[in-house]
């Protein structure tokens, strides 16, 4: 780690968004509050702490802020892989504002959010063209990405192992019509993976998300040109794999981009902040706005534009059913979020943190 002044050209090689000092007022304010601190990026996140770097070649274990160790501290306010922090020696002294992120409602009874990755330009939603192929799961990922500021790109792997690649692409035509890029690749073939180059330019950051066994680690190895990430075989009966990646990590690529690999996620719960129109359902939302009744359930109501589109073969009924399910989940999560915010506000007024606020998420 540098102990003198920021080396901005080197920081750019791990995703620093400016040619020199920060240009956003919110970042400038944090820098001003810590004049002796230097910027670094969180490149690994473990249950026991963080690893940060200010160059592509070197990283160090970092001592986190004391408040992050408190059991009730909101998990989404802790650093995540991709975050920029200010360091004094090996100690994190401040978390810089996030420019973009992808997050989910974390598993568990109590409401809390979990940041999957921060300050990312592109989210590669990876799904295998085998028994793992699931358009509904892809739609769920698109919902979580929508509104977070990053560009979603659907990557269908194992294009060399199936005769159904064209059928899968046909199923996803509705998403492509909404300008959501789709690419089918052989994750082991560098020439095939080259289709992802437009999103992996110098200084850009991308994150790979998808279920275990989808081919994320294989894709990472191909992009790196080396077998850095461990890969496991998938079960033939259901195409599911064991978790190859056990923690989130940011990896510099030869192209000059940074790639964040993530473990497979079983639960993809909304946070309540999602926008269905931005999350892959803009066409359904536009039709819903044309329904005769504002509270139309799109089942059998007269004047339902959504049902009319289904009957005309213009919308996939399974996709609409998933839209309805996700809409209910977002509404339910939004209610829980509103309740938590109200509890937080009451807690601030009394000088105490309420008992029901964020619990630590899984790192």
UniProtKB/Swiss-Prot annotation:
Residues 340-363 are annotated as: Disordered. One of its GO terms (cellular component) is cytoplasm. It is found in: Cytoplasm. Zn(2+) binds at residues 291, 296, 298, 304. Its main location: cytoplasm. GTP binds at residues 157-160, 210-218. It is an enzyme of class 3 (hydrolase). The keyword Cell inner membrane does not apply. Residues 112-268 form the CP-type G domain. Binds 1 zinc ion per subunit. GO terms for molecular function: GTP binding; GTPase activity; metal ion binding; rRNA binding. GO terms for biological process: ribosomal small subunit biogenesis. Its EC number is 3.6.1.-. It holds the Pfam family RsgA_GTPase. Signal peptide: none annotated. Its cofactor is Zn(2+). The keyword DNA damage does not apply. It comes from the Bacteria. One of several proteins that assist in the late maturation steps of the functional core of the 30S ribosomal subunit. Helps release RbfA from mature subunits. May play a role in the assembly of ribosomal proteins into the subunit. Circularly permuted GTPase that catalyzes slow GTP hydrolysis, GTPase activity is stimulated by the 30S ribosomal subunit. PANTHER family: SMALL RIBOSOMAL SUBUNIT BIOGENESIS GTPASE RSGA (PTHR32120:SF10). Monomer. Associates with 30S ribosomal subunit, binds 16S rRNA. Belongs to the TRAFAC class YlqF/YawG GTPase family. RsgA subfamily. This is Small ribosomal subunit biogenesis GTPase RsgA. It comes from Xanthomonas axonopodis pv. citri (strain 306). The gene is rsgA.
């Amino acid at each position: 780690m540098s102990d003198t002044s920021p080396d901005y050209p080197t920081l750019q090689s791990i995703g620093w968004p400016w040619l020199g000092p920060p240009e956003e007022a919110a970042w400038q304010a944090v820098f001003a509050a810590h004049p002796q601190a230097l910027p670094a990026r969180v490149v690994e996140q473990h249950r026991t702490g963080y690893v940060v770097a200010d160059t592509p070649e070197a990283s160090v274990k970092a001592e986190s802020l004391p408040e992050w160790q408190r059991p009730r501290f909101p998990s989404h306010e802790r650093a995540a892989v991709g975050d920029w922090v200010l360091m004094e020696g090996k100690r994190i002294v401040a978390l810089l504002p996030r420019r973009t992120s992808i997050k989910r409602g974390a598993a568990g009874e109590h409401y809390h959010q979990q940041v999957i990755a921060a300050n990312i330009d592109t989210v590669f939603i990876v799904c295998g063209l085998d028994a793992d192929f699931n358009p509904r799961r892809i739609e769920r990922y698109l919902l979580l990405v929508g509104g977070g500021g990053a560009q979603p790109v659907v990557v269908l792997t194992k294009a060399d192992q199936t005769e159904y690649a064209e059928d899968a692409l046909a199923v996803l035509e509705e998403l492509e019509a909404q300008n959501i890029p789709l690419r089918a690749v052989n994750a082991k073939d560098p020439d095939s993976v080259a289709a992802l180059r437009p999103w992996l330019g110098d200084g850009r950051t991308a994150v790979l998300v998808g279920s275990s066994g989808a081919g994320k680690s294989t894709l990472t190895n191909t992009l790196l040109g080396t077998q850095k990430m461990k890969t496991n075989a998938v079960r033939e009966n259901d195409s599911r794999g064991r978790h190859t990646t056990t923690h989130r990590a940011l990896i510099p690529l030869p192209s000059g981009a940074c790639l964040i690999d993530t473990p497979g996620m079983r639960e993809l719960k909304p946070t309540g902040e999602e926008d269905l129109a931005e999350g892959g359902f803009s066409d359904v939302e536009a039709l819903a706005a044309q329904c005769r009744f504002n509270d139309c359930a799109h089942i059998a109501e007269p004047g339902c534009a959504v049902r009319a589109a289904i009957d005309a073969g213009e919308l996939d009924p399974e996709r609409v059913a998933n839209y309805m399910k996700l809409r209910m989940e977002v509404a339910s999560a939004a209610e829980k979020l509103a309740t938590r915010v109200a509890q937080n506000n009451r807690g601030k007024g009394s000088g105490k943190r309420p008992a029901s606020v964020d619990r630590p998420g899984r790192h």
